[in-house]
A protein has these predicted regions:
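Conserved donor-binding/catalytic core segment of Leloir-type glycosyltransferases
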Residues: 7-37, 47
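Nucleotide-activated donor-binding/catalytic signature segment of Leloir-type glycosyltransferases, i.e.
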Residues: 57-77
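A short, well-ordered alpha-helix in the C-terminal region of glycosyltransferases
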Residues: 70, 147, 154, 161-176, ...
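Short alpha-helical donor nucleotide-sugar binding micro-motif in glycosyltransferases
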Residues: 76-77, 84-89
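Short alpha-helical segment that forms part of, or immediately flanks, the ligand-binding pocket
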Residues: 83, 101, 105-112, 128-129, ...
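Acidic donor-binding loop of glycosyltransferase active sites
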Residues: 87-102, 115
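Short hydrophobic beta-strand element within catalytic cores of glycosyltransferases
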Residues: 112, 116-121
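Conserved acidic donor-binding segment of nucleotide-sugar-dependent glycosyltransferases
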Residues: 132-145, 153-160
Length: 194
């Protein structure tokens, strides 16, 4: 994956890469992520992986806002290619807007590689619990492009801050989401119940 990640980085030299992934459907909030790109400087590029019914609408939005050089719809990204995108990105963004997004496992995939996350505070959803605000990333108001952009910049604006979020993301994954940790937690529950 490292070789493929380096190739991806070469495609976007001197850019901060924001990666997002999911079905192109309304509850994923990709229209707000595209809008957020308007508030980011030209040294950012947003890569959105996935297919779905909103593909043409999102492409029209990108073109209408003149963001073709800043936002790329990747289409289907095969599972074997995902590690390269997670390795290559500087940050992962989960812009979902409805509690249909119950957890957002893609956040955990990003954190396992030490990538900070920008996610949304969806009421009655586990998304903002998975991404600890101020530790592994930032959680923002759903449907708010400006807050998405501000959080992306806040995390990546200087190396010291960025490294702290990278370390926090990896630590959050280690403390809560490794397979061993989850098995230990389940066994602990069984022991209490029995």
């Amino acid at each position: 994956a490292q070789e493929e990640a380096e190739e991806l980085r070469r495609q976007y030299p001197d850019k901060k890469i924001v990666f997002s992934l999911g079905r192109l459907v309304p509850y994923k909030g990709f229209c707000y992520l595209v809008e957020a790109a308007r508030h980011l400087s030209d040294d950012y590029v947003l890569l959105i992986g996935g297919t779905g019914p909103l593909k043409e609408e999102l492409q029209s939005q990108i073109e209408g806002l003149g963001l073709e050089k800043k936002v790329r719809l990747l289409g289907y990204v095969p599972d074997e290619a995902l590690p390269a995108y997670f390795c290559a990105c500087d940050l992962f963004c989960l812009s979902s807007v409805m509690k249909t997004e119950a957890f957002g496992i893609v956040q955990i995939e990003a954190m396992s590689l030490g990538k900070p996350v920008v996610a949304t505070r969806i009421p009655q959803s586990g998304v903002s619990w998975v991404n600890a605000h101020g530790e592994s990333g930032r959680n923002v108001t759903p449907c708010c492009a400006e807050e998405l952009a501000d959080a992306i910049v806040d995390i990546t604006h200087d190396e010291k801050t960025y490294r702290a979020y990278c370390d926090g993301a990896r630590l959050r994954w280690q403390n809560y989401f490794t397979l061993d940790k989850m098995i230990d937690d389940v066994m602990s529950i069984y022991k209490r119940v029995l």
